[in-house]
Curated annotation (Swiss-Prot):
It comes from the Eukaryota. Disulfide bonds: none annotated. Transmembrane segments: none annotated. Residues 1-21 are annotated as: Disordered. Its EC number is 3.2.1.39. Keywords: Glycosidase, Hydrolase. It catalyses: Hydrolysis of (1->3)-beta-D-glucosidic linkages in (1->3)-beta-D-glucans. It is an enzyme of class 3 (hydrolase). This is Glucan endo-1,3-beta-glucosidase 2. One of its GO terms (molecular function) is glucan endo-1,3-beta-D-glucosidase activity.
Amino acid sequence: APGDLLWSDEFDGAAGSAPNP
């Protein structure tokens, strides 16, 4: 989801999202 920094763009597709642990 947009603004979601907890999941990688593989799931939310949001630019700037960090890779999940």
